[in-house]
């Protein structure tokens, strides 16, 4: 499976507008999965009450992309039980994953 991994450095990603830019980049590369560096997510994305993460992920998955958030999510889920539950449920599925690093992503892709 081909995936697009944006650079770790760059503007913070937040909401649907950022998702559209990522979609354009993924389409040009014929990717099937978008791997987003955790470091690129705006702080509000990990606060589920803002709904920004949901809007971002929904935009990508609506267009048929699988999504992986790549980075150490542990410090964030230690502070939020709702985020911990979201990550757990996401990782049980096939459309959105949270993985520690790119090697773990490649392992999940088999």
Language-model features: locations:
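Amphipathic, Lys/Arg-enriched alpha-helical "gate/interface" segment within cytosolic domains
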Residues: 2-110
